[in-house]
Amino acid sequence: GETTCDGKKKMYEMLAEFKPVHVIELPNCQTEAGIGLYRQELIRFKEVLEKKFGTVITEDAIRCQIHNRNQILAALNRLQYVMALDPAPALGLDIVNIVYGTGFKMKIDTLAEEVNAITDKIEAEYAQGRNIGKRARILVTGSPSGGAALKVVRAIEDNGGVVVCFENCSGMKPLDPIDEDNPDVYDALARKYLNIGCSCMSPNPRRMELLDRLIDDFHVDGVVDLVLQACHTYNVETSLVRRLVKEKKG
């Protein structure tokens, strides 16, 4: 587990009563000091795994997985950017279900190839004239939108819109690559994941910067801010999203 949101932290306490739990302490600031702390937490986690499974996790092995992960991130980014086409080639619900499903794949060595094959098919069919027609283009931001929260996406698309972009944690937010040229693999991982624009960060300018760019990239007509009950920090940031959308993007 990790200490991103308060709801998770309390849940891990209860989970630890009947399951082995290791919690990574996540600094809530994107500073050099925060990165240093998070780097140490990643090393501590590595040591816990080594002890638990009686193995040695080498830096070469980590580099290999960083490379594989970057390929997956690039493939997911490419898939979601097909929705920048206007009119959109597919419903947002179809795209988010594909993205959401990749998180449950156990065989990750071929995952990037599988996602790219789906994107190739969508692009080929679009070139032949297949699309969903002109609809209001909606961006969903805020809390993760998998599981029961997908009812919001269904409501939008059942009423004539299309969700062309998911800025949130289950969409575009975590897709920046890990720096493979960084000689320190733990520093590379810490910088990649601590610099995600999550609302648990204070301050959190990266979320608004990403949102600003995605509104333009996906030719967005409207923004829906999804806030789950346990995500109070996203609730607070709603005012910042409203200000960006209404005052800057117009």
Task: Please describe what each predicted stretch is.
Residues 39, 43, 47-163, 167-175, ...:
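A charged, amphipathic alpha-helical module
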Residues 1-59, 165, 169-170, 174-250:
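Trp/Phe/Arg-rich N-terminal binding region typifying the photolyase-homology
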